[in-house]
Amino acid sequence: MEIIPAIDLKEGQAVRLTKGLMESAKIYSDEPWRLAKSFEELGAKWLHIVDLNGAFAGEPKNLESIRKIRESCNLKIELGGGIRDEATIKRYVELGVDRIILGSVAMKNPEFVKEMASRYKIAVGIDAKEGYVAAEGWAETGKVKATELAALFREVPLDAIICTDISKDGTLEGINREFTQAIAEASGHYTIASGGLASEEEIPLLAQAKGVDGVIVGKAFYEGRIDLGTLYKRLSGCLN
């Protein structure tokens, strides 16, 4: 089970949203690169970054902050938010991003995702409201079921699936384990849970869910619900 801390970027600052609403943004740091460095010191191996402005704009909007984060740490980085074309993917890969997250474009142009997965390390981000896929910074909800989209990529060489129940995101109410496991089973891929993690006690339960291999830690860390340093030490030796 991979424990992945998250940094969501809005206008160069590290923030957290509630249920994907930009107006709910709470600022946690003006220096996201310092956060990244601290996550590495605590024992993290991966870092999850979302360019929130980019997710709404459909193009990179926090490039300088992302570059500084990359320069400040040796963590592996997965990044999403507004990535719609190969030129942007190349730009991030050249910057040193290890895994590219494709979200909105996965619903709107799955053939593009399949093509990119043959060339780059790609994760598909499946974000859902009431079981249906949401896109464009979660501002749009389509008619595609999340499990159907996951199944569509079953034979595609993806690096991971990252799934979020938007109704749980940023609420500290607990991750929707049933939804996460359904996505994992439908896709057959390494699956990372996201949205609503409330406490350390949830993590062993997620680890027991078939096909769920990682979890993203966001607001639970920033609000002091989870001590990442202690968690990494506790899990070493019993969870990979």
From Swiss-Prot:
EC number assigned by the record: 5.3.1.16
Main subcellular localisation: cytoplasm
Catalyzed reactions per annotation: 1-(5-phospho-beta-D-ribosyl)-5-[(5-phospho-beta-D-ribosylamino)methylideneamino]imidazole-4-carboxamide = 5-[(5-phospho-1-deoxy-D-ribulos-1-ylimino)methylamino]-1-(5-phospho-beta-D-ribosyl)imidazole-4-carboxamide
Keyword Isomerase: yes
GO-annotated cellular components: cytoplasm
InterPro entries reported in the protein's UniProt record: Aldolase_TIM (IPR013785), His_biosynth (IPR006062), HisA_bact_arch (IPR006063), Isoase_HisA-like (IPR044524), Isoase_HisA-like_bact (IPR023016), RibuloseP-bd_barrel (IPR011060)
Catalytic residues identified in the record: D8 (proton acceptor), D127 (proton donor)
Membership in a protein family: Belongs to the HisA/HisF family.
Record-given protein name: 1-(5-phosphoribosyl)-5-[(5-phosphoribosylamino)methylideneamino] imidazole-4-carboxamide isomerase
Biological source species: Wolinella succinogenes (strain ATCC 29543 / DSM 1740 / CCUG 13145 / JCM 31913 / LMG 7466 / NCTC 11488 / FDC 602W)
Gene (name only): hisA
